[in-house]
């Protein structure tokens, strides 16, 4: 708190015990950093890294033609000028984008086919316009076609290798089937599985499986190579009579002795026959120098040859590798004189025989056969040759153009398989595939564990930059095909690069991504918190992700690795639960896309100030202490053992073994959840509702920050982008409701930096959710501000803090059944004082087009409309600002030409005499839709270039230009004043060598010392002629004036550019002549049926608005504002609201005490009280002057603001102490009296101040009535829903109810004339007009539809009518 004066920033009494180690990082930096890395806009072309856009161009270029005679190479890209500002794009319905230009080089070769040499014949380099690319605004959003959108980051499975098993569910035998999968970012997937028969199979791209060894042989490995790679071997010696096994400590241990083994020099038995070779026995044998062990022939049954056996005499192959040994085999080998051979060592833990079985199945011997066989299986229709097949396999896995593991994939592969291949190698290598198979075989043999795919080490975040990079690549690949075709079709020498490149496919893909992708979403702009959380959202849905239907329970569940990375609370209720999540407060995404969280480094039991960001993989096996572990002043753990997390499990660890410590208790939860005070006392389900409902709170007209907050309110307000934040230190030189002007001091006296910043505030603009976006200055004239200070409040912020609702006095009490089922009883005072009044702005748009029948016209001259209806329109036919409008009122008058009708001779004559009549146009004016009643706050007119502007357009233009002129004049004036003050410091007391004149008047005489008065009145332009005796000073003067002149010209130029932009007309869609947008503001007061909620998931609907005098009141006569149902607390288990209400009572009562002291002007008592309340900041309070003390205390008249951080908040005894010091009952309850009877309620009642929000589900938007309206074309029944102006459906259950009551005539009326009996409807109308009350029902249209449908099925159906 000490960094800002108390008078400028509200102080909150904080109950947090844990010291703040590190500030919360900027809440929307993930979006910004990702997009900056993608564009590298501020990096010179030659210094750009191969990431993002640069990487995409490098991966597609160079593009070579089919014959190899020409190549199109990429050199660099650069960005053009931004044409329109963000605000202009929003108003004009345009996209905020920047043009991109690429420099490419076309190289033409002379190819000597015989020698295979290429010589460069020609090089042409050219810069080409390459379409536009949307830019991100400072707030991390995109403006697409005039609406703000957010690209949500996607959480998807990382590339790399994954091992898994099916838990025995796939096969009837219940055998566990193990699988491995190598997933690239781009290219073919490899799946390996060991099937129930224990054979290792491979699938490529989920096609038909084939034995894995087929692929290994295609890579050039022989059967022997594979057996020796996957298995250990044993060497045997064959003599005519006996068999010996070479002594090998590794393989021998654990085997049984088939013959008793004795010491070589004595009869001492080492291992008896039939016993196991133990470690001790093997060691004894090694010491005794035993080199071979005799075995029996039976021991070789079912054993397999590891290498082929050759005939020693002829060199022929007697038996191939992988041959099973039997008696005949041994006899044949003895006969041939074979003395040494090798067998495979098989024992538990040596890999099983799945590879050996696959080798028996693959039926190929050579590499060539294997290649052809795989090609035949994957491409059955194509003719197969060895060369084609080899090229195909190469292309599948080993070519960067077709296969990309990405740096992440390579890193994950290295980590999982224990490799150290450089990260730059982004294709697979043969060893990777082989090692994956070996790991899978070992896994089947119970060595190692399978991967957990829901672990955050195996899921990564694809932020905006990467999502757009993938789209851009798709566009470039489409363009590449077209370029190759053009290169081969036309004569290449005559072509320039721009003849080959057409950027349309790329632009189309980017446009499609931003416009229609599931991840590009309409920004939730209900309030600042909803904006921030929308930008921090992670979605598992979207292209390449999961679908709601397929996602199981595991993916949606909270995982231990989410701790500090993903919020376990904030997720939507409904089908998307767990698939859409939010980043935790301190979390960030690293360059590989993994979510990291910060920890304090702990060394030898001391928590240091060093901070380390770790991903879920990096914190594996590290004991992590919680943030609330008790520490002494030096940072050492107080207790000898510390409760820590290891791999998500809680364990007790010695303090010396702890490696890391959490940074803060709220690093666990998201921004929205950490705005809930006493979150630790709420049930998880209700906390979820609480964090979701805060995002639906409507910004109120009069904002008020919560008395009981969590200390995060300021951070959210600052980072959301709705408040104005000072970019540099400065002083406020001008401030009004629409702009703030800051003047900056220079660091050096004689230098000229930009002197002034003008902040234009947003006034009553419409947000995406139709809420009102309005900024108010919170600085005073002359105030000094620091960079990063909030200088203007936005919607739902107060004094730089988030303020979503209002503090109201709430009692928990049943009241006449009006708070049944969570209903809320509200005081009339809240409506009268506009406590929960909000402003909503609707936008209405009308366009006049050039139609086939002629031009539409926006005009006041509308046929068949009386003067009364036109009273609010100006001469141009557009409603005036400030007009109060109701449903049906005309906002913009518009007429459209009708089709030519055949005129009678009389009409022709009349038309010839009286000229054009209004008969050939129809009224298509924009009218106010039902349910909208308010005031016109803004109108915008956009006219096509070359169309004559009407008066209203000129008026709007003049206002805009006047505002620009004011900004320019202010900037120039401050610049001039600054220059003048700097000049005075340089030339004071100096003498001029020649007089400075303006016309004939002498401004500065020659030879006299220059005074401040001379310069005060002197214009700056003539001073350029000033020459001083001191040359050094003279030079500084001219340097200063030169900089001033340049800056002045730059300001003037920018002003002229903006004016020019306003005057030259607008870019409108084809066929549109003029577009008018009207904004109508509506005041929504709190009314019965509005949904309200607290911050703990305690939601309800307003059931009754009671007069103040009927509500329960305190002993001093103060009535409460709201009555809630006490039964809503116990079963919901959100006790946080009770603690909030108690602390709120204390805060309010302390505020009352401060107010009393202020009124009595008891300054000593006031200072003492303030020091008592803000005990942690007592020294600062003591240092305040009397005036400052009064100013600071004035902020707390309506209650003392407190902060109770999540998981580190106020304890029960602290609340009771505070209640006592505030002079109220420590129980937090009070005696209340019934306002209707004046009698006291039985028992004391829980009452206090609670923060309540009004949610976006307003009754005015939902209520709807219809008498007559549109009917469905086919069934002729009324449409449904408010948007269609529909009726209430009378369904079959309602028909049953009417039947049950026997109301036959009423029912007949419902089903015929009131619904779809067309003839009956007209007859009914006639009867009503004539005053007769006779019902004549006809045939309902829906019955006719049924008859026609049955007839269309070929069933002849007709209705037999009885004669009356």
UniProtKB/Swiss-Prot annotation:
Function: DNA-dependent RNA polymerase catalyzes the transcription of DNA into RNA using the four ribonucleoside triphosphates as substrates.
Name of the protein in its database record: DNA-directed RNA polymerase subunit beta
GO molecular function: DNA binding; DNA-directed RNA polymerase activity; ribonucleoside binding
PROSITE patterns: RNA_POL_BETA
Record note on quaternary structure: The RNAP catalytic core consists of 2 alpha, 1 beta, 1 beta' and 1 omega subunit. When a sigma factor is associated with the core the holoenzyme is formed, which can initiate transcription.
Pfam family, one: RNA_pol_Rpb2_7
Keyword Transferase: yes
UniProt organism field: Desulfatibacillum aliphaticivorans
One of the protein's GO biological processes: DNA-templated transcription
Keywords: DNA-directed RNA polymerase, Nucleotidyltransferase, Transcription, Transferase
Entry's family note: Belongs to the RNA polymerase beta chain family.
GO cellular component: DNA-directed RNA polymerase complex
Classification via CDD domains: RNA_pol_B_RPB2
EC number: 2.7.7.6
Transmembrane regions: none
Catalytic activity: RNA(n) + a ribonucleoside 5'-triphosphate = RNA(n+1) + diphosphate
First and last residue of the signal peptide: none
